[in-house]
Amino acid sequence: MKINFAVKPAQMAKLTQEELLQIFRKVKSVMQPYEQGNIVAQMNIEGKYDLWSHKPGMVIMGKPRPAINFVTIIIQSGYVGFYYMPIYTQNPALVAKMPPALMKLLKGKACFHLKTMDDALLQDVATAMKAGYDAYKKMGWI
């Protein structure tokens, strides 16, 4: 009996552009309140939005830096990428505050692949935003 290894398992239907935009807009609405003071949007177009901290005198890993990325969202081909830079700090207290449902969506070091959005997941994103903001503030980056 031969087994055909070329047959691929059923794949999840690809999200439409409108579905991706809906997810993008909901996450952006949670990010926007943080755009104040030293935190500014460097890119703010339909499909990409990012927030950077421009605090004068920041020193990161022993080097002076004019800015550091806080969070970015980008519509990709099959998901909305939520790039959450505070997770790079390797701060155990920050990781402990991350909602488990959101952590399941982490792909790579700092990118969460958002393919659905409901009130619970949106609240998880809000929780992550607050925890990341607090961590950056504690490090003197905001």
Where are these regions (language model features)?
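Charge-dense, helix-prone N-terminal extensions
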Residues: 1-142
